[in-house]
């Protein structure tokens, strides 16, 4: 009797996997035009559109009926760090960033989990009944519930956003990796280590996607070292780094004299805490940077502007050049 019940439970679980997979199999690749002008019910960027206006055209909720809203469902997010997440929503699927690189896909109507990705966790193999003859993976796994290992012990594990383009979801980790996942299954497509977390580097925000490039800003620039924070662009298909722009002016670069005679290892700060935005008409990416470190000029040992701290940078997404 017990074996019969277990078999029934397994059959139901496999059936549920097929139902959830059917939702994801209808996935349509996301284009640049969609990122610029999403369907009214979609939220495809941190601030919905690539220009980061944060405006939704939906009008069902009004001043008159907002008081009638009720809880439809709730979801317990990962508890390994601080939460500052903005999810993506596309075709009824919610893609949710969690602390320390954990990414989940939920049915936006019901809150049911479709898949989950955890750095360092290996997804279980598909049940035999869920494998078609061609060998294609058709079930959607919930990965191991052990704590995520990709975040290390850096910071508070904050991950503010994800990006979506083509058939992939893009995220960053607190140990300075950028990852791409199959949006249908959550399977890892590629993983690129961008900087050394042992030197303090980490991501606290996810990337944006512009003209086929995954662009992300680095943080963790409070420790003095022979390098500085930066914004980098990567091929969305492979993760290959295409360019890197320092957010601190180096001694031999334009603006380098704004730090006086300080050597590079004493030029700190200019973290890129928040995701950038894109103006397609000007073909420019805009990114904000934080203060110089130490904060006080007298402690830094310079009275200059300390470029490019406390700034909004305009970058050519193809060439990485800063437009001043």
Tell what function each PLM region has.
Residues 6-17:
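Bacterial N-terminal signal peptides
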Residues 43-47, 82-102, 139, 150-177, ...:
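Repeat-blade elements of multi-bladed beta-propeller folds
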Residues 57-79, 144-146, 259-260:
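A short helix->beta-strand "capping" segment at the edge of beta-propeller domains
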Residues 119-165, 173-231, 242-264:
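Asp-box/WD-like beta-propeller blade repeats and closely related beta-sheet repeat scaffolds
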Residues 228-240, 305-319:
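Beta-propeller blade signature
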């Amino acid at each position: 009797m017990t074996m019969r019940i277990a078999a029934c439970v397994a059959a139901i679980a496999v059936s549920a996997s097929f139902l959830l997979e059917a939702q994801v199999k209808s996935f349509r690749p996301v284009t640049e035009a969609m990122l610029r002008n999403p369907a009214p019910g979609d939220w495809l960027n941190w601030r919905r559109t690539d220009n980061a206006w944060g405006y939704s055209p939906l009008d069902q909720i009004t001043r008159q009926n907002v008081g009638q809203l009720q809880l439809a469902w709730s979801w317990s997010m990962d508890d390994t760090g601080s939460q500052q997440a903005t999810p993506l929503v596309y075709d009824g699927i919610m893609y949710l960033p969690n602390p320390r690189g954990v990414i989940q896909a939920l049915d936006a109507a019901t809150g049911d989990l479709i898949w989950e990705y955890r750095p360092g966790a290996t997804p279980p193999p598909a049940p035999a009944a869920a494998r078609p003859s061609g060998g294609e993976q058709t079930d959607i796994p919930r990965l191991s519930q052990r704590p995520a290992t990709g975040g290390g012990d850096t910071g508070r594990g904050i991950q503010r956003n994800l990006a979506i383009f083509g058939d992939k979801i893009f995220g960053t980790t607190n140990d300075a990796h950028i990852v791409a996942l199959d949006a249908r299954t959550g399977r890892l497509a590629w993983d690129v280590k961008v900087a050394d977390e042992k030197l303090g580097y980490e991501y606290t925000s996810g990337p944006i996607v512009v003209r086929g490039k995954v662009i992300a800003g680095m943080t963790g620039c409070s420790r003095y070292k022979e390098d500085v924070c930066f914004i980098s662009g990567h091929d969305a298909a492979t993760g290959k780094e295409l360019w890197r722009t320092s957010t601190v002016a180096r001694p031999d670069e334009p603006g380098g004299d704004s730090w006086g005679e300080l050597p590079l290892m004493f030029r700190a700060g200019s973290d890129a805490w928040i995701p950038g935005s894109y103006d397609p008409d000007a073909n420019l990416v805009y990114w904000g940077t934080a203060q110089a470190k130490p904060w006080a000029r007298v402690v830094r040992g310079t009275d200059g502007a300390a470029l490019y701290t406390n700034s909004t940078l305009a970058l050519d997404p193809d060439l990485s050049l800063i437009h001043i």
